[in-house]
Amino acid sequence: MAKIMEIISKETGGKSYNTEKYSYDTIGMPSFDYDDDGEKFIKWQVSGETEKHKTYVDLTNEAKRQIGKRPVISYFLDGSRHTYKVDDISYNKKVYPVIAGQVGIGCCKRTDGRMRPEKFYRRLVLSLPTVSNADGWKDDVFFAAQTKKLNKSEELKKLGIEFATILPYSPPKDQKNGKMEDSGIARIQDYMIESEKEMVAELVKAGKLNQDNYLLKDGSLI
C-alpha cells in the first residue's frame, strides 16, 4: 500500500503519513423511527405497484393454487462491503483518512430445488477527500484518470489487482460531531448499492426476470 499511496500523494499534491491500518466493522445506516402511535404512518413518495387497491386483497385461493407448483422466486441477490482505513493524507495542513473498500455482489439461481451461482462482482475501491482534486473541476474525470494511473502501476500489476474506481467524499456537514471516515465509508456503501442495481439491470436485460422468475433481494435497492 505504501507504493500506492506514494502515487496518490504525487498525483494529488498530498502528504502520506503511512499510518496504522485497520478495518471498520460497521457504519450507522439510516432507519425509520417506529412508535406505538397508530395515528402515524409512513407515506412513500413512489410506489412500485402497477394496480392500485383501496382494500386488502384476499390471496387465499391464489396461495392454494400455487401449492405444489415450481416456486416463482428463482433468483437471490445480496451485496456486502468491507472497509479499511489504509492511511492518512494531508492537504492544506488538514489530515484526511484514506479508505479502501472490498465490494462483493452475488446472485444465485434456484433450479429444481438446488442453488447455483448465477453472477458475481468482486470490486476494490478507494475513497479520497474531494480536496485531493485541487482544481475542483469535474471530479468524475479527475478520479477516473487517477484510477487508470494507479492500475497501470507495476505495484498493482505484480499483485494482480486493480481498482474499479476512486470515490471522492466530502467532509461531514456537522464538522463538530461528524466523523470524516464515515463520509468515505458512506460513499463505498452507496457504490455497493449501485452495483446491486447494476446486476439487477443486467438480469432484466438478459430476460431472466419475469412473472415466472422473481428475484429476492436482502435489503433495499433504493
Tell me the role of every PLM-derived stretch:
Residues 1-60:
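N-terminal alpha-helical "arm" segments
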Residues 47, 65-70, 87, 93:
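Hydrophobic, well-ordered secondary-structure scaffolds
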Residues 51-70, 203-207:
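A short acidic-Thr-Gly-centered motif at the start of a beta-strand
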Residues 75-77:
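Short hydrophobic beta-strand that contains or immediately precedes a catalytic carboxylate
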Residues 79-85:
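Short acidic, Gly/Ser-rich segments with clustered Asp/Glu that frequently serve as metal-coordination loops
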Residues 85-138:
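Acidic, metal-ligating active-site segments
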Residues 129-180:
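Short acidic, low-complexity segments enriched in Ser/Thr/Gly/Pro
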Residues 184-222:
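A two-mode feature
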